[in-house]
C-alpha cells in the first residue's frame, strides 16, 4: 500500500517538479562546444536540479588524462543577487520563447576561432571571458569583464538592447544587433586590476566621441592622448555600422516593421534558426538579414500573469497569409593598424 501511495504522490508531483526543473534539465550540461584543438569543451550548467541560473564551464583533461570541469563565469559573481531576477529585453524574450529557453543567467555564448575569448549577455549587459593557461600547471585560467558598459549607459536608446552578440573569428570584435542597428564593438585592451577604463569626456554621436578637449586626441580611434609613460591602452568602442529605419512613413516608431540582424518569426519557430547575421571566417565580411513584416497580420497578446499590463501587438504569419519580406546583404569591413573599425569598403544585396 505504501508503494502505491509513493507512486500516486510521484505522479501528482510530476507537473510541479517538471516545471521547477525546466523539464528536468537544470543542473545538466548543455550547449556544449569543442574549442581550440578539440581537447577542451565549453558548456553551460546551473548549480542544481532546481537552479535556473546557468554559468559558463570548461571541460578539460590534464597531462595524466584526468578529466576536470572549471567554472569560467558565474552570473551571481558578476551581477550578485540581480542574476536571479532577470531584466531581459523584449526581443530576447521572444527569441527564448521560440527556442523554448526557460533558463536564466548565461543562456547562450559565442566563442572565437582559437577558443580563447567568449562573449555572452546577462541581464542585457555584454561580457567577455578570456581563457588562458597556468604556465606552471597547464590548468586553464580565466578572467571576465563587461564590454563597453559606459557606452550602453551613456545612450541606451542608441546602443541597446544587446541582442545575439557574436564574436569575430579573430577575437578582436563583437557584432550585435539592437533590431534597428548592427553594432560593432572594438574590444579594447584588458584594464589593469583595480584600474577600470574610463570613456573620455565628450558626447557620443553614432559611435564617435565629439566635443572633446585638446588632450583627448585620436578619440575616433578609441585612444587616450600620449603621456610621458607612453600610449595609453585601447578602450572598448561601439559603432553603428548599418541600420534600418526606426520609424514608419508617418514618423511613428511604434509601427515600424523593419528589423535588421534578427531571424524572422518563421525562421525561429519553424526552422530553428535564431541568428540574423554571420561573420566570414577571415573576420573581414558580414552577411546579415533584414526583413519587413508589414504584410503580416497583427496579433494582440495579453499577459495572464500581469493582467494590469496592456496587450502588445505582434506580427505573426498564419495559413494563407504573407510571410515577412526577407533580404540578405553582405558587407566588407575595413580596420586600421590597431584592428579598430574604420568603415565599410563595399556592400551587395545577395537575396
Where are these regions (language model features)?
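Beta-propeller folds
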Residues: 1-351
